[in-house]
């Protein structure tokens, strides 16, 4: 930027300050009280608002995730499943739906969610049967239980 004379340079500095002030006041227009008119108060309020806005972006993700989990928990309990068992068995069945989609299904597509709950419940029952086995101990293992014949 080239300034040909001192008056032009001074004039430019003044206009720069004016536009800088206007930029801050533009962000402060919706604030209450003197914070939307007085530059000194507006600078503090706008800075504080920007800091909170930055922090809130990460908090929003956390809040939405807890909301989705609460909705899925409530919907899965209607079908007789707890949330951890429901999610774990869906993962074992290779159903790759995230929590947002599951929460939306629970609200807007209850029949679809019911079928997912049935799938999860069936997988859980299969796991119990596999864990129990046939009820006999394998050969060559000493048990503390004394068998009397």
Swiss-Prot record:
InterPro entries: Ribosomal_bL20, Ribosomal_protein_bL20_C. GO terms for biological process: translation. The keyword Methyltransferase does not apply. Keywords: Mitochondrion, Ribonucleoprotein, Ribosomal protein, Transit peptide. One of its GO terms (molecular function) is rRNA binding. PANTHER family: 39S RIBOSOMAL PROTEIN L20. Component of the mitochondrial ribosome large subunit (39S) which comprises a 16S rRNA and about 50 distinct proteins. Interacts with OXA1L. Belongs to the bacterial ribosomal protein bL20 family. This is Large ribosomal subunit protein bL20m. The gene is MRPL20.
